[in-house]
Amino acid sequence: EVEIDLRAWTLEEVQRVEEGLKALKPVLPGARLVLSGGLNRPPMEPTEASLALFAKARAIGEALGLRLEPGRVGGGSDGNFTAALGVPTLDGLGLFGGDAHQKTEYVVVPEIPRRTALLAELLAAL
C-alpha cells in the first residue's frame, strides 16, 4: 500500500499528475493497482483580487513597522477553498511565531499588538 500526498501550485498541475497516476498499469504478475481518494484542497492560486488585497495589507503593515512579503508554502488551509471560489484570500495574517503544528510551536508575545492592529486596520479598510 502506498499513500501519496500530492501538493501543487496550480489546479492544472494537479490534473496532470492525477491523469498520470490513472494511466499507471501494474507490471508484476498478480499485482493490482487501485487508486482511491482525490483532491483534499484545491491549490491557492494567486488572483488579481488577492494580490490587490495583499498590496493593501502590505501598506498597512509598513505603517505599523511590519514587513510583509508574499509567499507560498505548499500547505493547506480553509483559505484554499475561498480562493478557489474567486474570493480574494490572504493566508498567514495570524500571530507571528514558529514551529507550526508541533509540540514546540510558539508565538512571539511582544508582536501580538502589531499583528492584531494589522488585521483590524485591514478589515476597517475593506
Residue spans for each PLM region:
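Metal-dependent amide/peptide-bond hydrolase catalytic core
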Residues: 1-126
